[in-house]
């Protein structure tokens, strides 16, 4: 049985870790390399860096932070933000990323996903999906893709887009609920489950973790293969070890350090 992964996420802006609520109201949470080293020591299964300034301000990705983190840490590292070309993917992989997250560019051109997966292997291509519920209370649930850090609506159905990019070669999908992001009210389980049921690749649940039971629900109810969280770890509400123990006690297969 594949073990469930816990993935702390470091949102990086101007070289600092930040954490916002629904992609806004950013507050400083520390140095990314030091944070990464702490998560590595704590037993995190993977780490995710998202350069949240890159897409909408046309910033380059944080290669210096990535390379210093890769030198200091042994856990797999996913890096996203501002990835627009195959050359961007290559540069991040050479800097030390194990996987590269593609967001806005995949929405603009799903064939870019196929091109990157063919060149580097689908195992290192993660498509990041930022979605917001657009259906009314009496309608069937429907979510729309947003790009550029959640600023631009696209009119694209999130579940259909997930199906498209998984067929084009995405090895994994990072699904973030913009409605839940930073609220500490739990994942959007319906969104996570809808996408997990629609694709054959692993889904990472993201956006809204407030407690350890939310992590369990993301896997058990949402069908996620991995759970991503930020605030509960960054600000000391829980440790990665506590999260793993809680999930294991709930019957989920976890990688537990001796």
Swiss-Prot record:
**Annotated catalytic residues:** 11, 130
Cellular component per GO?
Answer: cytoplasm
Biological process terms from the Gene Ontology for this record are: L-histidine biosynthetic process
Q: Name one GO molecular function term.
A: imidazoleglycerol-phosphate synthase activity
**Gene3D superfamilies xref list:** Aldolase class I (3.20.20.70)
For this UniProt entry, what is the primary localization, expressed as one broad class? cytoplasm
Q: Give the metabolic or biological pathway.
A: Amino-acid biosynthesis; L-histidine biosynthesis; L-histidine from 5-phospho-alpha-D-ribose 1-diphosphate: step 5/9
Q: Catalyzes what?
A: 5-[(5-phospho-1-deoxy-D-ribulos-1-ylimino)methylamino]-1-(5-phospho-beta-D-ribosyl)imidazole-4-carboxamide + L-glutamine = D-erythro-1-(imidazol-4-yl)glycerol 3-phosphate + 5-amino-1-(5-phospho-beta-D-ribosyl)imidazole-4-carboxamide + L-glutamate + H(+)
- EC code: 4.3.2.10
The entry's keywords: Amino-acid biosynthesis, Cytoplasm, Histidine biosynthesis, Lyase
Tell me the CDD domains matching this sequence: HisF (cd04731)
Task: Tell me the compartments it is located in.
Answer: Cytoplasm
Name the SUPFAM superfamilies for this protein.
Answer: Ribulose-phoshate binding barrel
Tell me the subunit arrangement. Answer: Heterodimer of HisH and HisF.
Family from the record: Belongs to the HisA/HisF family.
Q: What does this protein do?
A: IGPS catalyzes the conversion of PRFAR and glutamine to IGP, AICAR and glutamate. The HisF subunit catalyzes the cyclization activity that produces IGP and AICAR from PRFAR using the ammonia provided by the HisH subunit.
Name-wise, this protein is Imidazole glycerol phosphate synthase subunit HisF
Annotated organism of origin: Methylorubrum extorquens (strain PA1) (Methylobacterium extorquens)
């Amino acid at each position: 049985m594949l073990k469930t992964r816990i993935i702390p996420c470091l949102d990086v802006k101007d070289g600092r870790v930040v954490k916002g609520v629904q992609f806004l109201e950013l507050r400083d949470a520390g140095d990314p390399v030091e944070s990464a080293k702490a998560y590595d020591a704590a037993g995190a299964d993977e780490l995710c860096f998202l350069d949240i300034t890159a897409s909408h301000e046309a910033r380059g990705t944080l290669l210096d932070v990535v390379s210093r983190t890769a030198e200091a840490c042994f856990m797999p590292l996913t890096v996203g933000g501002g990835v627009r070309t195959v050359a961007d993917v290559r540069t991040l992989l050479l800097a030390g990323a194990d996987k590269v997250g593609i967001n806005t560019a995949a929405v603009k051109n799903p064939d870019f996903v196929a091109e990157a997966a063919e060149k580097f292997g689908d195992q290192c291509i993660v498509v990041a999906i930022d979605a917001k519920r657009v259906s009314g209370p009496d309608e069937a649930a429907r979510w729309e893709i947003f790009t550029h850090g959640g600023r631009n609506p696209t009119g694209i159905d999130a579940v259909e887009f997930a199906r498209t990019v998984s067929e084009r070669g995405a090895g994994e999908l990072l699904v973030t609920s913009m409605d839940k992001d930073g609220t500490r009210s739990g994942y959007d389980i319906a969104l996570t489950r809808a996408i997990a049921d629609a694709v054959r690749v692993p889904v990472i649940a993201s956006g809204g973790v407030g407690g350890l039971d939310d992590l369990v629900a993301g896997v058990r109810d949402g069908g996620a293969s991995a759970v991503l969280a930020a605030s509960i770890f960054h600000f000391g509400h829980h440790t990665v070890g506590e999260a793993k123990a809680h999930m294991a006690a709930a019957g989920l297969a976890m990688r537990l350090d001796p």
